[in-house]
A protein has these predicted regions:
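Hydrophobic alpha-helical connector segments
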Residues: 60, 73-103, 158-159
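Solvent-exposed, amphipathic alpha-helical segments
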Residues: 18-25, 71-76, 161, 165-169
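Amphipathic alpha-helical packing segments from all-alpha helical-bundle domains
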Residues: 70, 99-110, 117-146, 155-160
Length: 206
């Protein structure tokens, strides 16, 4: 436990991490201000110095994780021509699919105040699924220009299909612990890229 008056670096991230661990371990019923600060090793009042309450913490946690994935996606167009298209898409798909644990995602959707905060932030321009989708589309356009995708590939639709399906998986299937996010991402990318690369995930990639 950190003593009063002693600065703790990256307090918000510590609180986010603590909340994620509690949600994964105990579910929403275990998420209290005291439980979070205890898990994070912070003073009891630390949470309310950074957030108005649990709803704001959950909303900011989700927005922070989305922003992190969006920053990763922003780098994709600059990596066109590197590795393989499949590998690059699997990396970003896996990052998005693992950005939130299922309980956190479910709580964000089912808590009206948190859901409203997230929606308002995204509408105001906070990076989220739309930004990730646009970065993927830009990346696919760059790969098409290099001949690593079929010329007729609808890159916008392909990006939408990838992000939309991962969003669905993120929100609906992670309660099943038998599911492997890496396998899910690989199967999805293989299916989506098949028609654009002659039916083989590596075919035609130079």
């Amino acid at each position: 436990m950190s003593p009063r008056g002693v600065a703790i670096p990256d307090v918000r991230e510590r609180l986010f991490g603590a909340a994620e661990r509690i949600l994964a371990r105990e579910g929403p019923s275990g998420l209290t201000s005291r439980a979070i600060t205890t898990e994070a090793g912070c003073a009891k009042g630390m949470l309310h110095k950074h957030f108005a309450g649990l709803d704001e913490l959950v909303a900011e946690l989700v927005l922070t994780r989305f922003a992190s994935t969006a920053r990763l996606a922003e780098d994709l167009p600059g990596r066109a021509g590197e590795s393989t298209v499949a590998a690059n898409l699997k990396t970003i798909g896996y990052a998005l699919l693992t950005s939130l644990n299922p309980t956190t995602a479910g709580l964000a959707v089912s808590t009206p105040a948190a859901s409203l905060r997230i929606r308002e932030a995204l509408e105001a321009g906070a990076p989220g699924f739309d930004a990730i989708q646009q970065s993927i589309a830009d990346y696919l356009d760059a790969e098409a220009e290099r001949g690593r995708l079929a010329p007729a590939t609808d890159t916008t639709a392909l990006a939408l299909a990838l992000v939309g399906t991962v969003h669905h998986l993120l929100m609906t299937t992670w309660g099943d612990t038998a599911r492997d996010p890496g396998e899910q991402t690989e199967r999805l990318v293989t299916m989506l890229l098949g028609p654009t690369t002659g039916g083989s995930i590596g075919h035609g990639e130079r």
